[in-house]
Amino acid sequence: TILKIMENLISYEKITGTTGMSNISNCTSYVTKIGSFAICSMNISVITDYTKAVIKSPVAFKEGVFITIEDNNGDLYSTNRQQVIGWYNPATQTFEASNINAGFTVLLIGRI
């Protein structure tokens, strides 16, 4: 039936952990999958502020994933710097970020 098809088309998952990451103390990801697309919101805390971090997506996105970052604490400090995001590597499911203060949110959208 149509209802069963829709139930199998959309899924949601909450994932926690920092395996495969560096300079990350905590990470909680919220993943919504719709067919062959996924939206992943990651709430992340860094160990050392403004130092490069390697972040691993809990979702194996294909090439062409959209990534954006919001530094949730950056505007609170006079040392605020421009955030930098590296390219997503589909082979390792990782990307790099820098100039982040304390906690931040990442949004990834792409094909799976």
Could you describe each region identified by the protein language model?
Residues 1-35, 39, 62-63:
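Glycine-rich, low-complexity segments
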Residues 25, 34-112:
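Extracellular attachment/recognition segments
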